[in-house]
């Protein structure tokens, strides 16, 4: 891969097209080459179009990302914009992990919803009619376990705990819906137990309403 990249750069192209150049490599080498490609691109100042299905590659390498579905552009923006402010449900679900919570709009002006009768605040007005059925999108890293003043709270039971190294992913059963909660791993962390009753918390600004 390094030789192929060197050959492409030898002719001093105005635009460099890379079509999934790291897909056949193992994880560690892929991360190393990803950083190397980014360093070379910035050093030489060559406009680069990088095609990938790897979301982490797209977020870490890009100045701007184009998210496409079925040949149509879903959204164009910086990695920060694409991840934190997705404009479509497809973009939100495609980039990173995402929880989708079925809710009913209670008060569009104040951004209040309900989930199985429990109030959920979004912190901003909602463009939908009272009583409309929507979904609340929340990233797993925005969720926590336990009570937190001023946050939304949903009661559930732990269905699974998966250790992923830097994070611990907890799958919480809310009845007919599951939430993934990502906890930052630290040596003093007490791992939750399967079947343990828990309360999931998240701040109103961490979620947004979608179809």
Residue ranges of predicted features:
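ABC ATPase nucleotide-binding domains
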Residues: 1-90
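Nucleotide-binding/hydrolysis machinery
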Residues: 94
């Amino acid at each position: 891969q390094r030789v192929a990249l060197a050959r492409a750069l030898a002719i001093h192209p105005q635009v460099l097209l890379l079509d999934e150049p790291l897909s056949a490599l193992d994880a560690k080498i892929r991360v190393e080459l990803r950083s190397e490609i980014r360093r070379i691109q910035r050093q030489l100042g060559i406009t680069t179009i990088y095609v990938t299905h790897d979301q982490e590659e797209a977020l870490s390498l890009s100045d701007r990302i184009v998210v496409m579905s079925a040949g149509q552009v879903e959204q164009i923006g910086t990695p920060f914009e694409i991840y934190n402010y997705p404009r479509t449900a497809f973009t939100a679900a495609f980039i990173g992990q995402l929880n989708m919570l079925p809710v009913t709009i209670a008060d569009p002006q104040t951004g209040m919803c309900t989930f199985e009768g429990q109030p959920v605040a979004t912190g901003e007005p909602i463009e939908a009619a009272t009583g409309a059925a929507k979904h609340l999108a929340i990233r797993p890293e925005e969720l926590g376990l336990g009570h937190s003043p001023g946050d939304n709270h949903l009661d559930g039971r732990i269905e699974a705990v998966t250790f992923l190294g830097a994070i611990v992913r907890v799958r919480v059963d809310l009845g007919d819906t599951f939430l993934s909660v990502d906890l930052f791993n630290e040596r003093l962390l007490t791992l939750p137990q399967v079947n343990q009753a828990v309360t999931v918390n998240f701040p109103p600004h961490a979620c947004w309403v979608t179809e």
